[in-house]
From Swiss-Prot:
Reported function: Component of the ribosome, a large ribonucleoprotein complex responsible for the synthesis of proteins in the cell. The small ribosomal subunit (SSU) binds messenger RNAs (mRNAs) and translates the encoded message by selecting cognate aminoacyl-transfer RNA (tRNA) molecules. The large subunit (LSU) contains the ribosomal catalytic site termed the peptidyl transferase center (PTC), which catalyzes the formation of peptide bonds, thereby polymerizing the amino acids delivered by tRNAs into a polypeptide chain.
PROSITE patterns: RIBOSOMAL_S19
Biological classification of the source: Eukaryota, Fungi, Dikarya, Ascomycota, Taphrinomycotina
Subunit composition and interactions: Component of the small ribosomal subunit (SSU). Mature yeast ribosomes consist of a small (40S) and a large (60S) subunit. The 40S small subunit contains 1 molecule of ribosomal RNA (18S rRNA) and at least 33 different proteins. The large 60S subunit contains 3 rRNA molecules (25S, 5.8S and 5S rRNA) and at least 46 different proteins.
Organism: Schizosaccharomyces pombe (strain 972 / ATCC 24843) (Fission yeast)
Domain of life, per lineage: Eukaryota
Protein name: Small ribosomal subunit protein uS19A
Length: 153
């Protein structure tokens, strides 16, 4: 009788324990992504990002990554690093950038974005919209032929 009760308690504890989904980019977990060499990482990217990486990131992107590393090392333990501002909207998000806070320029101001694992392989510009989405109001006079019959205010 006691064995059945212990078994029931153990099963209840297992159900209670929440399992969190670990992030995987193309089947490779984040910890393993950080350990991959540049060539192995490039093989995981989609064609456009792969071509960009093979042609080289360039001096501006390298300088940006150095600033991100510096901000991460200077950040206190268990705190977000300082924001690193950039105009590089065409920068591909790499695994080492995860956890950083980036100010992405949209043509007018810098939008602060915290880099999450789901963003790997995307461009920075995808997370800072450059236009203000329209909010359509009521149609004005002359919008359509039927608007002639709408009484004026």
């Amino acid at each position: 009788m006691a064995e059945e009760h212990d078994e029931a308690v153990r099963v209840a504890e297992l159900r209670k324990k929440r399992s969190f989904r670990t992030f995987a980019y193309r089947g490779v977990e984040l910890e393993q992504l950080l350990d991959l060499s540049a060539e192995q990482l490039v093989d995981l990217f989609h064609a456009r990002a792969r071509r960009r990486m093979l042609r080289g990131l360039g001096p501006n992107a390298s300088r940006f990554i150095r600033k991100l590393r510096k901000a991460k090392t200077e950040a206190p333990l268990n705190e977000k690093p300082a924001t690193v501002k950039t105009h590089l909207r065409n920068m591909i998000i790499l695994p080492e950038m995860v956890g950083s806070v980036v100010g992405i320029y949209n043509g007018k101001l810098f939008n602060q974005v915290e880099i999450r694992p789901e963003m790997i392989g995307h461009y920075l510009g995808e997370f800072s919209i450059t236009y203000k989405p329209t909010k359509h109001g009521r149609p004005g006079i002359g919008a359509t032929h039927s608007s002639r019959f709408i009484p004026l205010k």
